[in-house]
Regions:
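Membrane-embedded alpha-helical segments of multi-pass membrane proteins
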Residues: 49-53, 109, 131-139
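Charged, low-complexity, helix-prone segments enriched in Lys/Glu/Asp/Gln
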Residues: 24-31, 90, 125-129
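Transmembrane-helix motifs of polytopic, lipid-linked glycan transferases
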Residues: 114-119, 128-145
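Aromatic-acidic/polar surface patches that form glycan- and anion
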Residues: 68-72, 102-106, 133, 137
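Aromatic- and Gly/Pro-rich amphipathic surface segment
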Residues: 50-70, 78
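Juxtamembrane/transmembrane-helix boundary motifs in multi-pass membrane proteins
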Residues: 9-13, 120-125, 129
Length: 145
């Protein structure tokens, strides 16, 4: 058998590239604005809540000056906790903090992709969650364009 012929893969059109760049540019612009409004507090993107189970642990890890913008936190809290331990090696701790551990354990792609950023420290882990979001916006825009 000889080599298999493959059809050439067309490069994305200029309009697709422009759309993706606009979407990613807008996302990065919003990240920059938020980072300027809350300098040194990337946890703002996580949206910890004052009445949640996550906040006391987050204050232990990230410091007492943790920015807590809401009464009730958002899903970012759970993703932050999962990104700290994506293999659930310390599952007993997570089970005491998670609002719904079985539900959260089914949603592992995002925190697993963000987890390596934690090699740069806790702040790196927080920025990793943001970076993965921006990358997802880029991919989603590409496939939708």
């Amino acid at each position: 058998m000889g080599p298999v012929a493959t059809a050439p893969v067309a490069a994305p059109s200029a309009s697709v590239r422009t759309t993706v760049l606009a979407g990613v540019g807008l996302a990065i612009g919003l990240v920059v604005l938020a980072a300027m409004a809350f300098p040194g507090h990337p946890e703002w993107f996580v949206k910890f809540g004052g009445q949640g189970h996550y906040t006391p642990y987050a204050q232990q890890v990230l410091g007492e000056d943790l920015l807590v913008p809401l009464d009730d936190g958002h899903d970012g809290q759970g993703y932050w906790l999962q990104a700290r331990d994506p293999a659930l090696l310390n599952g007993s701790r997570e089970a005491t903090i998670f609002d719904r551990p079985a539900y959260r354990a089914q949603r592992m792609l995002y925190p697993t992709l963000a987890a390596p950023f934690r090699l740069a420290g806790e702040q790196g882990g927080l920025w990793g969650l943001v970076a993965v979001n921006v990358a997802a916006i880029g991919l989603g825009t590409f496939f939708a364009a």
